[in-house]
UniProtKB/Swiss-Prot annotation:
GO terms for biological process: DNA-templated transcription; viral genome replication. Homotetramer. Interacts (via multimerization domain) with polymerase L; this interaction forms the polymerase L-P complex. Interacts (via N-terminus) with N0 (via Ncore); this interaction allows P to chaperon N0 to avoid N polymerization before encapsidation. Interacts (via C-terminus) with N-RNA template; this interaction positions the polymerase on the template for both transcription and replication. The lineage of its organism: Viruses, Riboviria, Orthornavirae, Negarnaviricota, Haploviricotina. SUPFAM superfamilies: Phosphoprotein XD domain. Belongs to the morbillivirus P protein family. It comes from the Viruses. The N-terminus consists of a long intrinsically disordered tail. The central part contains the coiled-coil multimerization domain (PMD). Forms a four-stranded coiled coil structure. The C-terminus constitutes the alpha-helical domain that binds to the nucleocapsid (N-RNA complex). Residues 236-252, 266-278 have a biased composition (Low complexity). GO terms for molecular function: RNA binding; RNA-directed RNA polymerase activity. Residues 137-160 have a biased composition (Acidic residues). Residues 304-376 are annotated as: Multimerization. This is Phosphoprotein. The gene is P/V.
Amino acid sequence: MAEEQAYHVNKGLECIKALRARPLDPLVVEEALAAWVETSEGQTLDRMSSDEAEADHQDISKPCFPAAGPGKSSMSRCHDQGLGGSNSCDEELGAFIGDSSMHSTEVQHYHVYDHSGEKVEGVEDADSILVQSGADDGVEVWGGDEESENSDVDSGEPDPEGSAPADWGSSPISPATRASDVETVEGDEIQKLLEDQSRIRKMTKAGKTLVVPPIPSQERPTASEKPIKKGTDVKSTSSGTMAESSSTGGATRPALKSQWGPSGPNASAENALASASNVSPTQGSKTESGTTTSRISQSNIEPEDDYDDELFSDIQDIKTALAKLHDDQQIIITRLESLVSLKGEIDSIKKQISKQNISISTIEGHLSSVMIAIPGFGKDPNDPTADVDINPDLRPIIGRDSGRALAEVLKKPASERQSKDTGKLGIESKGLLKKEFQLKPIEKKSSSAIRFVPDGSVASRSVIRSIIKSSHLGEDRKDYLMSLLNDIQGSKDLAQFHQMLVKILKN
């Protein structure tokens, strides 16, 4: 309901802005009004006759709402009274249109939409809205005579906000109570309307739904409203509100006497309090702590306080649960990251194992083709261990027959050889190797792994330069020795320089 009311308010404001931006000619307004009066005369004649009889009984005339004030035009809302009543309305409207120097007006047909969203077509079915395009405070809007039949508001249903339904035909209607009329509604009034609607929804919803409390308003005291429905012996149903008083003390305010008579049976007013111009403040009941409070105000405030406390506690519980979920999520993410790192380490270990398996297979393949070297050859003849006999039964490491390698290098196989002395177990094998397999003795006059013998080659000079650079001598002496090495010519001089260098390094 609140959304529909806000929709109508927005539509009304758009209509007012359009009328202010593009005012019509007064002649066009007069012609449109005359056409509207002629169209609505025949349809409202029967209903207005019954309204006149009821108005005579109540001693009231057709309702007209004057709007007089500074900066406003005096305009009346007159329902069609037949052939005689329409002339008075035409005269007043003609006088209002004649004053074109002060105000400019226009008539616009406001399209009415029912609750299903369907548009009501036709001039007769629409609300004829007369809008004054003057100042903002002086804008008054009213509808035509056919609005009670084609309006989108059902007068038989009670208003959820608690306001009485309007009888568009015979009873005086306030423009503020019509949902289809266009009004200038301020932002504060819209906010109050939304607050009342949300408060009613909060009272009717189940307790499981989390409802945010409305914004507190200091202008209007909060009170629990209860709709009242009872018969009034007429076609419509009276709808009102019953609210508990939030006042803690004082007197009943005097109310102005209404100028309109009752439209139905009289109601008893025996319990109404008389007005008072002056009253002394009342004291509430004192509590044990010494503070003065009111039982009524406490009964009104305590439900709201309890609701606020419950809402606050629920919000705190939700925040705590969300924080715990966040902490658990962080722990899970940390463990997942550790699992990812472990997976990488496992993959690297598997790769290393596969590499080691390949290396072991390669080594096994190499060992299958390697034989043990026979010791005793390639030695210096002057070495005392040079005459040691070689074991002829030496076997290879892997996959070789007994004596296979030795039989290939010996002049005679070991099985065919016989020992000279039958009493000796050893088999003499010296000089039995083939000549091509025997190692040559080391020459003392040439360079080998055991000594360096310089000659006139470039390699010998490079070796001597390396010896000088790697020595512990000073830089000056190194430079001096390098210069001497460059000046030496011949192998003999180079050998003498090498001997001198060895002596210098030993000292």
